[in-house]
Amino acid sequence: VFAALLALLAPCSVVAQQAREDADALSARIDGPPAPIAPAVINRDDGGNATVRAIRLTAPIELDGRLDEAIYQEVLPISGFIQVLPGDGDPATEKTEAWITFDENSIYVGARMWDSAPESEWIANEMRRDIGQLRNNDNFGVAFDTYYDRRNGVFFYINPVGGHSEFQYT
């Protein structure tokens, strides 16, 4: 089991986007499902798009990669992931569970990834930060659609040996 915990935007200032007067017009332009209603953590549409809900933390978590805090037992994980390579859009061949949580200062992504292959067969040999080659390793990534337009945002990913990268996409 490969477990990862990414602390994103720490420390950060949280600024809400300007509210739009015409919410109906905005929702008509969004290609995908609305945010899930608690206790659900993911909402999918027939087109394969997904929207997830972040959980507000009521107790601190430790960034140790163990994912043993109560939140990971109390909140359903995000699951049902899809592949990018190989088989873009195919269901994941291995089990993956993820949680997105936040507090006043940070957003946290915790994930457990299982692999039926022994560790010696993992494709994870890149440790240089922010190198494109890292995408050719086994990895876990998360994209934040910060404008909720399915076109612009930031992407973070990590491999089993700790190599990591982030980039902005438009």
Give a label for each model feature:
Residues 1-13:
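Bacterial N-terminal signal peptides
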Residues 16-170:
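Structural preference for beta-rich elements and adjacent junctions enriched in aromatics
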